[in-house]
Amino acid sequence: MTELLVTPKSVKHIETLIEKGADAFVIGEQRFGLRLAGEFKREALIEAVELIHNHGKKAYVAVNGIFHNYHLNALKSYIDFLHEVSVDRIIFGDPAVVMYVNEQPNPIPLNWDAEALVTNYFQCNYWGKKGAQRAQLARELSLD
């Protein structure tokens, strides 16, 4: 399934992107997600998810950072928060995210996005068996 996936700079920017035909939005906090266009702290994230859902669109949260042991308590708290907010999908790269998400009663769907290149089906199959439902492939791949 192809969808127009965008990374907004702010809640106000989401409104413009909805008007332009965006299907899904990648948002999140800079300390948990990589390559985000804007910072969506918890209050802004709640507002953004509500706006996105009210327009029948999808809210994905980037939790694709690299997490060390000292990040794990904050990571768990953030994933619990994302579950409460009812985000549509988490974009991840670190196995700790999978473990915490799968502790939830109704796990949030996962989208594997390792910041390394995803170039073969072995990688996709491996993470699929671990709970990922989608993968973001390397830009270097052709559609063939």
Region spans (language model):
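Short beta-strand/loop segments at the ligand-binding rim of alpha/beta enzyme cores
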Residues: 1-4, 55-64, 103-115
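N-terminal basic/disordered segments at the start of proteins
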Residues: 1-26
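Active-site beta-loop-alpha junctions enriched in small/polar residues
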Residues: 7-11, 30-32, 64-68, 93-96, ...
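Conserved, mostly hydrophobic/aromatic
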Residues: 17, 94, 127
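Glycine-rich, proline-tolerant flexible connector loops at the mouths of alpha/beta enzymes
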Residues: 24-45, 62-70
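Active-site-adjacent beta->alpha loops and helix N-cap segments on the catalytic face
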Residues: 33-51, 92-106, 121, 139-144
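Catalytic alpha/beta core domains of metabolic enzymes, predominantly
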Residues: 109-144
